[in-house]
């Protein structure tokens, strides 16, 4: 006995099935995404440390590994496929993790690997010339990264954007309520 699902967009069908299977829409976990060409791994490590020091139980999905208390595995991809993402968020929730920090690559955004993930917030580090074999040009690359911020499912979202980066300043125009940060612009502030 085999069930077959027909859908015009197989990637959408996959993440919807993953979300339904692992009920990631109702988890008791705050998910934060970090995107940018450079600095995602460093940012997730810093966030993990700060949140742990603040008393949170933290999980991290990123370039080096996927880890949470009692679990660590080498990461074959910066951002895994939807089945793995949703499964791991459910596993973290079952282990009492209350904050998950995730590196979100442009490939993952474009390929719908993080669709259905209940992001509570996101951070943008920078955008430099990379992955143009995939995105064709910087404008397409930027628009893909911006989707993480513009398509966040929660109304109350926390956004942090590097205002020292020219693409970050452009993202701030699209997300005026975001917290801006940077060395050149002074202390973090809302625009």
Identify the meaning behind each predicted range:
Residues 71-82, 130-137:
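Flexible beta-alpha connector loops of hexameric P-loop NTPases
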Residues 40:
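Conserved lysine of the Walker
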Residues 1-2, 110, 119-191:
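Acidic, Mg2+-coordinating active-site environments of NTP-dependent enzymes
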Residues 17, 34, 61, 85, ...:
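Residue-level signal for inorganic ion chemistry
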Residues 58, 99-100, 178:
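Hydrophobic anchor at the start of a short beta-strand
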């Amino acid at each position: 006995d085999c069930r077959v699902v027909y859908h015009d967009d197989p990637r959408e069908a996959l993440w919807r099935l993953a979300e339904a299977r692992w009920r990631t829409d109702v988890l008791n976990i705050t998910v934060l995404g970090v995107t940018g060409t450079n600095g995602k791994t460093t940012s997730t490590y810093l966030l993990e440390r700060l949140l742990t020091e603040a008393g949170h139980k933290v999980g991290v999905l990123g370039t080096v590994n996927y880890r949470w208390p009692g679990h660590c595995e080498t990461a074959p991809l910066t951002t895994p496929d939807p089945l793995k993402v949703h499964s791991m968020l459910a596993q973290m929730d079952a282990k009492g993790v209350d904050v998950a920090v995730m590196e979100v690559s442009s490939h993952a955004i474009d390929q719908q690997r993080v669709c259905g993930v209940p992001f509570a917030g996101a951070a943008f580090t920078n955008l430099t010339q990379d992955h143009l074999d995939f995105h064709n040009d910087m404008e397409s690359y930027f628009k893909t990264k911006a989707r993480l911020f513009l398509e966040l499912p929660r109304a109350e979202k926390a956004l942090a954007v590097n205002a020292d980066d020219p693409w970050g300043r452009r993202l701030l125009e699209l997300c005026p309520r975001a917290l801006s940060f940077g060395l050149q612009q002074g202390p973090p502030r809302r625009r």
